[in-house]
Amino acid sequence: MNPAHLLVLLAVCVSLLGAANIPPQPLNLLQFKNMIQCAGSRLWVAYVKYGCYCGPGGTGTPLDQLDRCCQTHDHCYDNAKKFGNCIPYFKTYEYTCNKPDLTCTDAKGSCARNVCDCDRAAAICFAAAPYNLANFGINKETHCQ
């Protein structure tokens, strides 16, 4: 084999090894983001670091109604995980958006439908809850005990 080809092959292998360390992104986050946009007027990024429960993880007492929406969403995902091999963060689903109405269309009782119902309920809850800017980007270690 030509030494130049070996170098190219080596470079490809090394870059693939680096890519293997990149964590996979949840597949349904795009769907959840779109549901949030359908149900309400705030951008989805407004919820990423809000309160004690919005965004990754969650602990302590929710700070307000919006934070309770996120806590309820977390618990809903926990319940969805109990049905067979259901991994909510990676499960895609079918739904329709007729602003501001959301309809989940997968078969009732399926993993996809359970996850969709969780995201739908959260998006509707987000749209109805007041937004307290003081709860965005808080220090969870001091405020969420």
Curated annotation (Swiss-Prot):
Name of the protein in its database record: Basic phospholipase A2 1
Cofactor(s) the record lists: Ca(2+)
Propeptide segment residues: 20-27
Protein family membership: Belongs to the phospholipase A2 family. Group I subfamily. D49 sub-subfamily.
Catalytic activity: a 1,2-diacyl-sn-glycero-3-phosphocholine + H2O = a 1-acyl-sn-glycero-3-phosphocholine + a fatty acid + H(+)
Role description: Snake venom phospholipase A2 (PLA2) that inhibits neuromuscular transmission by blocking acetylcholine release from the nerve termini. PLA2 catalyzes the calcium-dependent hydrolysis of the 2-acyl groups in 3-sn-phosphoglycerides.
Binding positions for Ca(2+) per the UniProt entry: Y53, G55, G57, D74
Active site: H73, D119
One annotated GO biological process: positive regulation of fibroblast proliferation
Enzyme Commission no: 3.1.1.4
Organism: Bungarus fasciatus
Paired cysteines (S-S): C38-C97, C52-C144, C54-C70, C69-C125, C76-C118, C86-C111, C104-C116
Pfam families recorded: Phospholip_A2_1
Database matches in InterPro entries: PLipase_A2, PLipase_A2_Asp_AS, PLipase_A2_dom, PLipase_A2_dom_sf, PLipase_A2_His_AS
